[in-house]
Swiss-Prot record:
It is a multi-pass membrane protein. Belongs to the ABC1 family. UbiB subfamily. It comes from Shewanella woodyi (strain ATCC 51908 / MS32). Residues 123-501 form the Protein kinase domain. This is Probable protein kinase UbiB. Is probably a protein kinase regulator of UbiI activity which is involved in aerobic coenzyme Q (ubiquinone) biosynthesis. The gene is ubiB.
Length: 549
């Protein structure tokens, strides 16, 4: 670990303890080494006992900076993991940071272009149009055609900052997983890895540009969604250039009403857009919060959406799409047995799951929803409650399903904000039924046969040999399985022992360094460091050797 990373680790620990996050872990699950680690930071006490857990976590994220703020925002969408009170607190986090100097922005833009800004642009505005934790936006005019454009450039050194904070998050998540147990529903390591995938995608602006081009092509001349044109020849990993658009923020209800926007059409169009992206195109915008959605100023009686920021996109497998559509249809038919079957058939929960118990759990959660009219039932809430129930039966929610759930909740909230009488079920049901008939009915079967026929015609002569090879492999697999399991269990025991020693040694070295910097007695600082080094050597030597299973 570098001195910088040690300082950052201490800052994270200090902030977490200052807000008493350690007190939120139940005492009964805290092992001895957790209590030992807490004692080594005896001078750091909870200064916010009057605040509830969700507010404490929000303030910690806020104090630790942009990477943690975005992590908190992502956590706020994981309502399958967090209680609503915690999620609502984290949703208040704002991704707003002061802009960096425009001279640095110019240098970074010119570095990507390989030439002066004046070669391609006129009227470059040194005052940023917007500034966020990952990037900053400036406006200009293209020399070639005189059109207004937006330049989005990454913040300086943001990749290194993100990488350093992600490394610390991963270590903290692995430690928490050890403390809480791998069966805990929070699954911290899984959540951090999902966040890593998301934020690393946002750091590649070229990928964002490619996503925007694809989404734009999917809805060309649709009259429902417009994506700004990307000047691909001027798009790079750290810089993208796009058409500048004029629209009304979707959250500005006063402006929408003032221009006479047909809010009913706009709300229904939003729901249709979501299901079209998911089921027709299998490519959906997964960051559709109000800051990324605008409404056209023209044709208010037949309005369309304008979508920005395509850094986070979602896709589903064909199987997941079918199971998802069937889930919604089964729910509205109150067929809870079919819902339980679908979760097992899809592989979302284990085939060993007690289907009767799962069906009963689904019924307990879903049946009370029908005490309200159908037009008040939320698709997103249905999906969320089903995921929460399935987690009790050891479902691991795939990242793409999390993105889908988050986007659906956004779209529903937006639709009901625009038009409170919006009937989501009546808007979506025809689309789902049509899609299901095309996929599962005779038309869908004929389409699949046509698509797969060349492959099976090519493989048919090899079928007897493939059957024989698979039977042979099956016998060998059963024989080797027990040997592999024994080796794996021994490796795990060694790994746990090594981790305890390494964690304790790291804390002692950090404490020794802090004591030394605070002019404490030499025996205390050097003693702490020496014991830490000895434990580190023991932990290093006891590490399991990497083996191939």
């Amino acid at each position: 670990m570098t001195v910088t990373s040690i300082r950052r680790a201490y800052q994270v620990i200090k902030t977490a303890l200052h807000y008493g996050l350690d007190e939120l872990i139940p005492s009964k699950v805290k092992p001895w080494y957790f209590r030992l680690l807490r004692c080594t930071f005896f001078w750091l006490r909870n200064q916010h006992k009057d605040k509830v857990g969700g507010e404490r976590l929000k303030l910690v994220m806020q104090e630790l900076g942009p990477v943690y703020i975005k992590f908190g925002q992502m956590l706020s969408t994981r309502r399958d993991l967090l209680d609503d009170e915690w999620a609502e607190e984290l949703a208040m986090l704002q991704d707003r940071v002061p802009p960096f100097d425009s001279s640095i922005a110019r240098e970074m833009i010119e570095l990507e272009l390989g030439t002066s800004i004046d070669t391609y642009f006129d009227d470059f505005d040194n005052t940023p149009l917007a500034s966020a934790s990952i990037s900053q936006v400036h406006t200009a005019t293209l020399k070639s055609n005189g059109k207004a454009v937006v330049l989005k450039v990454l913040r300086p050194n943001v990749e290194a900052q993100v990488d350093a904070d992600l490394h610390l998050m991963s270590q903290a998540a692995n430690f928490l997983e050890t403390v809480l147990g791998h069966g805990n529903r929070l699954r911290p390591a899984e959540v951090v890895e999902d966040y890593r995938t998301t934020i690393e995608g946002e750091l590649n602006l070229k990928l964002e540009a490619l996503n925007a081009v694809k989404l734009r092509n999917n809805f060309l001349d649709s009259g429902s969604l417009y994506i700004p044109y990307m000047y691909e020849e001027l798009c790079f990993t750290r810089l993208i250039v796009m058409e500048r658009i004029e629209g009304i923020p979707v959250s500005d209800m006063a402006a929408l009403k003032a221009q006479g926007t047909n809010l009913k059409v706009l709300a229904e169009r939003g729901v249709e857009l979501f299901f079209t992206q998911v089921f027709r195109d299998n490519f959906f915008h997964a960051d559709m919060h109000p800051g990324n959605i605008f409404v056209s100023r023209e044709h208010p009686e037949d309005p369309y959406y304008i979508g920005l920021d395509c850094g986070i996109m979602g896709t589903l497998t064909e199987e997941d799409k079918r199971y998802l559509a069937e889930n919604f249809l089964a729910f509205f038919n109150r067929d809870y047995h079919r819902i339980a079957q679908l979760y097992i058939e899809s592989g979302w929960v284990s085939p060993d799951t007690d289907i009767a118990a799962f069906e009963q759990a689904v019924k307990v959660v879903c049946e009370p929803m029908f005490n309200k009219p159908l037009d008040e039932i939320s698709f997103g809430h249905v999906l969320l409650e089903l995921f929460r129930t399935a987690r009790r039966f050891d479902m691991v929610v795939q990242p793409q399903l999390v993105l889908l759930e988050k986007t659906l909740l956004y779209i529903e909230g937006l639709g009901r904000q625009l038009y409170p009488q919006l009937d989501l079920w009546q808007t979506a049901k025809p689309f789902l039924e049509k899609w299901m008939s095309e996929q599962v009915g005779p038309k869908g079967m004929a389409s699949k046969i046509k698509k797969e026929f060349p492959y099976w015609a090519d493989k048919l002569p090899e079928l007897p040999e493939l059957v024989y090879d698979n039977l042979k492999m099956g016998r060998n697999f059963v024989k080797s399985q027990n040997q592999m399991l024994d080796r794996y269990l021994k490796q795990q025991q060694k790994a746990h022992k090594s981790n305890y020693l390494l964690i304790t040694s790291a804390v002692l070295v950090i404490c020794g360094t802090i004591l030394f910097n605070q002019n404490a007695t030499l025996w205390a600082s050097y003693g702490s460091i020496t014991v830490g080094v000895v434990l580190w050597l023991l932990g290093w030597r006891s590490r399991p050797k990497k083996r191939k299973f």
